[in-house]
Amino acid sequence: MIKGITSKELSIIKEILQTFDAKFYAYGSRVKGNYSDLSDLDILVKSNKNIIPELKPLFDNSYLPYIVNFTDYNSIDEKFYNLIRNDLVEIK
């Protein structure tokens, strides 16, 4: 479960993500529950190609009240993945 976001915000996030052929997982403080109102939303992107440059402007223009940061699964360090893997929440 992603914490600290409204159902309207989640709908905006899902609407943007559903246009891409990829899997998306939230992680970080908004999953763990140790977030503040100023916390960003961290999203791990699993895709056959790097779609992050396409995602960023869509979220920058989405009027969400927080920053959304993306991490490409194909380029992350194994140690970092091991730190976050138990906290991954798929965004469907």
Regions found by a protein language model. Give the residues of each.
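Catalytic core of pol beta-like nucleotidyltransferases
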Residues: 1-26, 31-38, 46-92
